[in-house]
Amino acid sequence: RIVEEYQAKNQRIVYKKIENKGIAANTNAAAQLAAGEYLALADHDDILAPHAMYTMGKAVLQLRRRKEPDGFVYSDEALFSKSIRRPIAAHFKPDYAPDYLLCCNYICHLAVFKKALWDAVGGERPECDGSQDHDLFLRLLERTGGAAHVPQVLYYWRVHAGSTSGGTEAK
């Protein structure tokens, strides 16, 4: 109901109920509905800072003005359980570090990238469910040659049983 209320007020909001075919397949289905120039991956139970999209968009525009690659931008994140006012931990990430990214997905959330890049690599691969974002980021960044880091906590990742925010054994 909440989504339908927002959808009635803003035609840019698209909602489509689909069967659960796994995280990668469902993310691919959602990306097909997107009409914008950029995509951002977010989980259904996490929270964006109120200024997250503005800040990421501003970062893209600044990159364009400097004639730097603007295909991939990521931010810092915080983990929370009950309230974002009391984070459990913060992930203050390094600037783009390709060797480190090969070892682990330090980017996670919030990542914003060009939809044309997503389309070029074919989106997420269902056979990579569990590490689908890491696989995607490696393939996207192979094309962009790098990413820009916004050193601000813009994404709040909810920690709960069954979520990888609490540990990878949930996969």
What are the functions of these language-model segments?
Residues 72-108:
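Acidic/His-rich active-site region of diverse nucleotide-sugar glycosyltransferases
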Residues 39:
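Short aromatic/hydrophobic "clamp" motif used to bind/position activated sugar donors
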Residues 35, 49-50, 114:
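GHKL-family ATP-binding catalytic core of two-component histidine kinases
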Residues 1-17:
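Acidic donor-binding segment of Leloir-type glycosyltransferases
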Residues 97-171:
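Conserved nucleotide-sugar donor-binding catalytic segment
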Residues 18-34:
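Glycine-rich, basic loop-to-helix element that forms the pyrophosphate-binding segment
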Residues 43-47, 76:
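The conserved acidic donor/metal-binding loop of glycosyltransferases
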Residues 51-87:
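Conserved donor NDP-sugar-binding/catalytic core segment of glycosyltransferases
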